[in-house]
A protein has these predicted regions:
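Structural/interface elements that position substrates and couple domains in central-metabolism enzymes
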Residues: 1-373
Length: 373
């Protein structure tokens, strides 16, 4: 069988590539990062929760190879796009990575190939943004010459109960033939594939999942603030409420949202809603509450020091953990970053300790350059 291509070998693309390879499908991965390609070729991982042994086994079996050369797209029968979809400086969707990748594919697209977008995005992206670039750049027609579908990534780094293969895979094709072609590739690999009527449904499914979580976290964060003022233990309240066997789902307060999905995805939905002259006030309010939590943490640190007759300015503060969740090395959108920046802005002397992140890597989020103590 033809190779399966994966463009973008990060926290989404690499697990997807390994899942196909371990199912017996040959995979050719593409990434612009020479260091990643070299490590994969040597059987080494660069993501903590993916051990070297998985990479080495896939490479040794001939099931996984990686390259920086887009001209090798001619070797694959299907290609999944797994590139970042961040927000720009104005908190608007940034599809530049997706569109740049689409142009690279379009210049090399051949009849019979399948293109699948896996990057999280707003409803309409596959049909309204990706499709015109692919058809215009290749001269081919979707559904006749090539196939196009959307299947949202649902990665949860560090989850010990679910992995890429066992998480149900939602899949929507631009045409019926597109869906059938995508199912032929995905059904032998994943435990369960959930076909839907089109890419818009699949796109909104992912956005809704993460908006649901973000809104509920905002609710419990607001409850946390109220409980602080009332002198009530919010954790005891949640634990007691969680004894109800129906109609309640526990969410827990925290210093803010982290990861690439939950802090970002609701803004993709509100952006699209504005096209329909609708203001998603509930979602936007949740975003305001969650984005304000790091400031609350800084204020609480200052209050704690004041209770011991110490000012925040000049005090040494140690931040324990800077990843966005436990036991991973991923600090994308981590609330630890604005917490550290807020403490520094008020004159604190800040260090951090994280066994999985020895030094803060360059990110779009911050210019901080600290090393773990």
């Amino acid at each position: 069988r033809e190779l399966f291509g994966v463009i973008g070998l990060g926290y989404v693309g690499l697990p997807l590539a390994l899942t196909f390879a371990e199912a017996g499908v040959g995979v050719l991965g593409f990434d612009i990062d020479d260091a990643k390609v070299e490590r994969l070729g040597a059987g080494k991982s660069y993501i903590r929760q993916i051990p070297d042994s998985r990479i080495a086994a896939a490479v040794a079996a001939g099931g996984l190879a990686a390259t920086t050369d887009y001209d090798r797209l001619s070797e694959v029968g299907a290609v999944a796009i797994c590139v970042p979809t961040p927000l720009d400086g104005h908190r608007q969707p940034d599809l530049s990575y997706v569109m740049a990748t689409a142009r690279e594919i379009a210049a090399r697209l051949r009849p019979g190939q399948l293109v699948i977008l896996e990057s999280t995005t707003y409803p309409g992206t596959t049909r309204e943004e990706l499709l015109p670039v692919l058809e215009g750049g290749s001269g081919l027609e979707v559904g006749r010459d090539f196939q196009l579908a959307f299947s949202p990534e649902r990665e949860d780094p560090g989850n010990k109960h679910f992995n890429t293969r066992t998480i149900p895979k939602v899949l929507g094709g631009v045409t019926d033939d597109c869906l059938r072609a995508a199912l032929e590739w995905y059904e032998p690999v994943f435990d369960r594939v959930v076909p839907v009527s089109g890419p818009e449904v699949a796109e909104l499914t992912k956005i809704f999942e993460n908006t649901f979580r973000g809104v509920n976290i905002a609710l419990v964060n607001e409850l946390k603030i109220l409980c602080l003022k009332m002198g009530i233990d919010v954790y005891e309240v949640i634990e007691a409420a969680n004894t109800k066997p129906f109609g309640f789902m526990a969410f827990w307060p925290g210093p803010g949202l982290g990861g690439h999905c939950i802090p970002i995805d609701p803004f993709y939905l509100t952006y699209k809603a504005h096209e329909y002259e609708m203001s998603t006030r509930f979602i936007e309010l949740a975003g305001e509450i969650n984005s304000g939590m790091p400031r609350l943490v800084v204020e609480r640190v200052g209050e704690a020091l004041n209770s011991h007759e110490k000012p925040l300015k000049g005090s040494r503060v140690l931040v324990l953990g800077i990843a966005y969740k436990p036991d991973i090395d991923d600090m994308r959108e981590s609330p630890a970053v604005p917490v550290i920046e807020g403490l520094l802005a008020r004159g604190a002397l800040v260090d951090y300790h994280d066994p999985y992140i020895p030094a803060m890597p360059p990110t779009r989020q911050t210019e901080l350059r600290l090393e773990s103590v």
